[in-house]
Amino acid sequence: MDEEPERTKRWEGGYERTWEILKEDESGSLKATIEDILFKAKRKRVFEHHGQVRLGMMRHLYVVVDGSRTMEDQDLKPNRLTCTLKLLEYFVEEYFDQNPISQIGIIVTKSKRAEKLTELSGNPRKHITSLKKAVDMTCHGEPSLYNSLSMAMQTLKHMPGHTSREVLIIFSSLTTCDPSNIYDLIKSLKAAKIRVSIIGLSAEVRVCTALARETGGTYHVILDESHYKELLTHHVSPPPASSNSECSLIRMGFPQHTIASLSDQDAKPSFSMAHLDSNTEPGLTLGGYFCPQCRAKYCELPVECKICGLTLVSAPHLARSYHHLFPLDAFQEIPLEEHNGERFCYACQGELKDQHVYVCSVCQNVFCVDCDVFVHDSLHCCPGCIHKIPVPSGI
């Protein structure tokens, strides 16, 4: 009984004696402390990369969304469901920006069942449209982890061995209603090399801990909305690939976009293979991307040809995936007083006013904290190093 008060307070540890963090400066202001907290938050993600490790570049990810009655709770505003769907819209955009040759699918579980909101696809607009429509979804019943994971596994287990197979579960409930022993399913997921990660919205659940541990995934419980967004962002970058996963050359096609007009006598309207699966899209169109192997037409890339199975991509898609393999090294942090050069950021040309500046170890150019974060999060290459590369004389 003596341990009970201590155990009930343990989750509140991050909020104990918070006044000790705040320190006044000589003028009695707390501005310096607040700026330091914001600065550390900005710099945190710069160091969160895997380094020189093997990554699963071609990803197949199913996102399982809890649609049970607990999603109507209002601890996230306006409620858990609306907040989750908004954050997932942001996640889908970031996911395809950083993983353009990957695919994603969405599953909703409620009333002890699981149903697909979207199939595995590389089209972000399709997923975002479905997420916007799901705001009006009614939340009721209990979720079923077993049915959701079974549905995801039925598709993922047929994916090629050189791709990563992942499931991300947004779990709000503290219970799951399953038709069979979920621990047997966990063994099947592990055998199929499917990595399952969970983001909990309520509290830690034992079966989720076992699920993440056995499949090599992660399990976190959110603190607030900003922490929720941060946890989702962690799943944007590709995870390290297992050492025994297949490694082989992949055939890819690079179709050029053909533009045709009605005035062109040789132009012939044709069906897009993507339109054949949808009744809402127009049928016959001019131009598009034509598979170099079988000449099947598609309206956008990347896509896997439904006729010959060739992966169709563009060169920028591969370039945007390449930076994960060789992440930019973190810039060296030095106090502003120790910097003897110009007091201007090399990237934005703004005056350096922060207490610390950041120096590229290769080109020795200096950056402010905002440009440092932008370079590592979005640009993925140092502007100073690029400008030092000599341009061929023939160009």
UniProtKB/Swiss-Prot annotation:
The keyword Transcription applies. A zinc finger (C4-type) spans 291-308. Belongs to the GTF2H2 family. It is found in: Nucleus. It holds the Pfam family C1_4. SMART domains: C1_4, VWA. GO terms for molecular function: zinc ion binding. One of its GO terms (biological process) is nucleotide-excision repair. Keywords: DNA damage, DNA repair, Metal-binding, Nucleus, Phosphoprotein, Transcription, Transcription regulation, Zinc, Zinc-finger. The gene is GTF2H2. The keyword NAD does not apply. It comes from Bos taurus (Bovine). One of its GO terms (cellular component) is transcription factor TFIIH holo complex. InterPro entries: C1-like_sf, Ssl1-like, TFIIH_C1-like_dom, TFIIH_SSL1/p44, VWF_A, vWFA_dom_sf, Znf_C2H2_type, Znf_RING/FYVE/PHD. The modification Phosphotyrosine is found at Y95. Residues 60-236 form the VWFA domain. PANTHER family: GENERAL TRANSCRIPTION FACTOR IIH SUBUNIT 2, GENERAL TRANSCRIPTION FACTOR IIH SUBUNIT 2-RELATED. Component of the TFIID-containing RNA polymerase II pre-initiation complex that is composed of TBP and at least GTF2A1, GTF2A2, GTF2E1, GTF2E2, GTF2F1, GTF2H2, GTF2H3, GTF2H4, GTF2H5, GTF2B, TCEA1, ERCC2 and ERCC3. Component of the 7-subunit TFIIH core complex composed of XPB/ERCC3, XPD/ERCC2, GTF2H1, GTF2H2, GTF2H3, GTF2H4 and GTF2H5, which is active in NER. The core complex associates with the 3-subunit CDK-activating kinase (CAK) module composed of CCNH/cyclin H, CDK7 and MNAT1 to form the 10-subunit holoenzyme (holo-TFIIH) active in transcription. This is General transcription factor IIH subunit 2. Gene3D superfamilies: von Willebrand factor, type A domain, Zinc/RING finger domain, C3HC4 (zinc finger). Component of the general transcription and DNA repair factor IIH (TFIIH) core complex, which is involved in general and transcription-coupled nucleotide excision repair (NER) of damaged DNA and, when complexed to CAK, in RNA transcription by RNA polymerase II. In NER, TFIIH acts by opening DNA around the lesion to allow the excision of the damaged oligonucleotide and its replacement by a new DNA fragment. In transcription, TFIIH has an essential role in transcription initiation.
